[in-house]
């Protein structure tokens, strides 16, 4: 385990104390809001640092008691029993602090753009894409996040050929970023008379939602085309040109939004375009970091098969961390915390291991 950065820990405690004092002094409302945000960010790690100090003192006291030849047998026995528990607590606190002090992904606190596209498997792939969207929608609802569909293309038998949505809330990207990749499903279609299992797939992409300050999109770099929105069967929803297609000329990226309001469509399409460009910048930066290339969980390779959903066996397997759960029904209802948390823990363990190698 890497050595704890004592100087940094002391600085965090000092800053936390300073924030407490300034908040108690009754600053202006806007200043108070900023201080409160920093306070809530620092509180978990400072709490762990203070508990670490108490645990270190407790270990030192117990060892001193055991080293003292005048300690009676009863006290010695109690100290010998207590020491392993305190040392285990100390080790846990050290690991917790190291995780808290890991370099933060600047995008973690952002909302996200969720894109799901049917892959191989025709109608079954579209149905599965719909199942995945509902799974994430329920997961988001459980977190108090807001989901808004930006654009969608329905499959012939239901589900979606493609669906793009915003998931808005604090820390959305940190929870969903490891969902990017190919999701494979194995199940017996309703139309299958012989009971044969079919395999199909859908691709998920999760992008941090970019704001105007994150990425600049110059007016001369885009072409905006308006079209008539089409409903089921190609019928026009209205008589005005409302669908918007934005092409980013330098990269060739094309984004379309086809809701009823042209103004909303332009804003939504720009929102997705900014997020895709921001994601491209992040992917480029990540590929230049050898540490990220070593991390399979953190690679974000959207061509990689990351998870298999086997309906006949009620089994879900995440291939990146070799995690298998027989909770498919519950997961499809949005209960994906166990997989999400395991992926985050694996990524953090990889970061800690790299710090240990550098120490």
Curated annotation (Swiss-Prot):
Keywords: Cytoplasm, Methylation, Protein biosynthesis
Mod. after translation: Methylated by PrmC. Methylation increases the termination efficiency of RF1.
Keyword Membrane in annotation: no
Recorded GO MF terms: translation release factor activity, codon specific
GO cellular component, one term: cytoplasm
Region of interest (Disordered), ranges: 282-309
Family under the similarity heading: Belongs to the prokaryotic/mitochondrial release factor family.
Protein name (database record): Peptide chain release factor 1
Source organism of the structure: Allorhizobium ampelinum (strain ATCC BAA-846 / DSM 112012 / S4) (Agrobacterium vitis (strain S4))
Top-level taxonomy: Bacteria, Pseudomonadati, Pseudomonadota, Alphaproteobacteria, Hyphomicrobiales
Name of the coding gene: prfA
